[in-house]
Amino acid sequence: MSATHLPDTQNSADTRHIIIDKVGIKDIIHPITYIDCDGNKMPTIGMFTMTVSLPEHVKGTHMSRFIEILNENSCEFSAHNFDQIIDKVKEKLESDTAHITLNFPFFRKKEAPSSGVKSMMDYQVTLYGTLNKGEVQVMIKVVVPVTSLCPCSKSISKYGAHNQRSHITIKAKVSKGRTLHIEDLIDLAERKASCELYALLKRDDEKMVTERAYDNPAFVEDLVRDIAVDLNADDKISYYCLESENFESIHNHSAYALIENLKC
């Protein structure tokens, strides 16, 4: 029997009359190319979750069409063009709502502060795209690892201060008609930290980053407040959720702070 004569069970009627808010595929891994703010193309691996709503009278969605969308397209993404794949899901799945999440490692080449030796630094990035009532919204989340050094420890200790790796997480909704780059959020987080991280450091670099952190102590509260000042002033961002988790080197727990702001 040819495919054209096989029954299409998904399109059959459903008598329970219950709308499904989200149905689709979750955590499918697919190669992608990310285009950075300078137009450079970076091959990486993305994990997608793609869903649509399902009317009460339809039995099932067409799961294979989500995969077809990934296979038919070049899978070249940037924060600026992410809304295009949402439109493709809407058209191919014939739905009024669509939700897409793309999670991937993003790499930047960084120079060590003294020796200038270059290495690749990785950041975990998530793009969120939502279509609802004809409006497309895009959000960017980036996790930026940094160094934080305790101001209290510095003030009371003769020989140094405890410091640790911290994760600053910024989730930002892009204002309508504006472009927000991943690099903008990474630069902001690293600029406000006690010191940024590098994959490769020589001895003179290690001396420099250690002293830089000592000269720029910051509580977890300082980190989120300093970053929030800049996020509040950035009209490319209409909403943000900002977190910092410090993996305390002298405790078996983390210090944590969060600021959330719906700007408009």
Swiss-Prot record:
Pfam families: GCHY-1. Signal peptide: none annotated. InterPro entries: GTP_cyclohydrolase_FolE2 (IPR022838), GTP_cyclohydrolase_FolE2/MptA (IPR003801). Keywords: Hydrolase. The record marks 150 as: May be catalytically important. It is an enzyme of class 3 (hydrolase). Converts GTP to 7,8-dihydroneopterin triphosphate. This is GTP cyclohydrolase FolE2. It comes from Vesicomyosocius okutanii subsp. Calyptogena okutanii (strain HA). The gene is folE2.
